[in-house]
């Protein structure tokens, strides 16, 4: 890849272990430096020479890149929804709020485009990794010449890490014995804590640290990955800061929330239930979110709301009392998951602030990789695996 050339910054005595340099950007990856010492027959006549250590430019910002999963445009309060997302709102109030960002309709393609800066087909992800084919653009392989932002920043001296969902490893390489070339650690991310695939049980996930499977939930009934992931990210940031406070970090934070299965803690379910956000039903909720979005300016003020699709979903007033109870319970679980996830993201950001590094940290918080998911059908399901296997549970069966 070719980038715009920059002035090279150097420090220390040339050829000594203390020497550092920044990259010009003319060529990525940078060519190996030529040996600058002297080699003679005798050690006393020879002169050692160390290649300068590559460091980022002075005042290079830290980067915290956050993306949630299957969260729609009208879900968070930041964009007019009723589910409280104070962390996202805090960033919106002190930064910029984008409402014209585009994603693909699937997890893997959006994520491949995000980490490579390329069209998802160019990065090998025309579909999710589980549906890969042996054709260009659809093989689920990020080629070596499609460097990730992790690889580029690592080569420029950043500490790089990936927390949460990895849906960009080919399904045929998602094994505890590898190969690991297309795992996060093989794509330029020095540290990985998360799961490989489209989703995970948040209580007992198929969890890895780097490429080693771990089981931190064993013997801990209240353990949840949403919290554990934030804990591990905070621990990692503290270690980077303690060992080399001058080293900027790039942290890719991609939780499994709010992709099914929806696994918030009971504490968060109770919090959302007590707010009674959904008691008025989906017709009034839709109108309220629509008006909120116009008020916030995230949709044009003259936008017209489409008629309710009664041929597909009946009006709330036509639902039975038992149906209303079921649907409210479903959405409260989802909302609790969204709010819980936003809270834990806030803890990570607070850790950055506690280090005194918030003002020099670029934070990007993307609300959902592909919008609200249609998985589960129009009336939802208590069993995601059953739905994926073609078993749709009618409302009557769910209420039993």
Predicted regions and their residues:
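Short acidic, Pro/Gly- and aromatic-enriched capping/linker segments at domain boundaries
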Residues: 4-20
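Formylglycine-dependent sulfatase
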Residues: 21, 26-400
């Amino acid at each position: 890849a070719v980038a715009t050339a920059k002035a090279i910054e150097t420090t220390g005595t040339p050829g000594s272990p203390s020497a550092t340099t920044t990259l010009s950007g003319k060529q990525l990856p940078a060519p190996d430096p030529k040996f600058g010492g002297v080699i003679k027959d005798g050690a006393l006549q020879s002169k050692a020479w160390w290649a300068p250590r590559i460091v980022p430019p002075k005042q290079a910002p830290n980067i915290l890149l956050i993306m949630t999963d299957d969260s729609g445009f009208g879900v968070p309060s930041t964009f007019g929804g009723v589910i409280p997302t104070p962390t996202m709102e805090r960033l919106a109030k002190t930064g910029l709020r984008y409402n014209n960002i585009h994603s693909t309709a699937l997890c893997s393609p959006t994520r491949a485009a995000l980490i490579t800066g390329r069209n998802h087909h160019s990065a090998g992800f025309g579909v999710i990794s589980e549906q890969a084919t042996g054709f260009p653009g659809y093989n689920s392989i990020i080629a070596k010449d499609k460097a990730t932002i992790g690889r580029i920043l690592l080569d420029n001296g950043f500490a790089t890490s990936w927390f949460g969902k990895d849906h960009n490893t080919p399904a045929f390489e998602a094994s505890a014995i590898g190969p690991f070339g297309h795992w996060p650690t093989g794509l330029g991310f020095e540290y990985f804590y998360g799961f490989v695939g489209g989703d995970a049980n948040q209580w007992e996930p198929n969890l890895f640290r780097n490429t080693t499977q771990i089981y931190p939930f064993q013997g801990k009934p209240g353990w949840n990955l949403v919290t554990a992931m934030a804990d591990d990210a905070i621990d990692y940031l503290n270690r980077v800061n303690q060992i080399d406070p001058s080293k900027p970090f790039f942290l890719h934070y991609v939780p499994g929330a709010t992709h099914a299965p929806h696994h918030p803690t009971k504490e968060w379910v109770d919090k959302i239930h007590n707010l009674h956000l959904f008691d008025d039903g989906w017709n009034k909720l839709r109108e309220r979110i629509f008006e909120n979005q116009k008020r916030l300016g995230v949709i044009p003020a003259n936008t017209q709301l489409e008629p309710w699709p009664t041929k597909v979903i009946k009006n709330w007033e036509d639902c039975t009392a038992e149906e209303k109870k079921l649907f409210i319970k479903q959405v409260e679980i989802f909302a609790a998951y969204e709010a819980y996830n936003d809270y834990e993201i806030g803890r990570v950001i607070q850790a950055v602030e506690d280090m005194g590094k918030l003002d020099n940290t670029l934070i990007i918080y993307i609300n959902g990789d592909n919008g609200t998911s249609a998985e589960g059908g129009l009336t939802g399901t208590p069993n995601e695996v059953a739905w994926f296997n073609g078993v749709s549970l009618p409302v009557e069966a769910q209420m039993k």
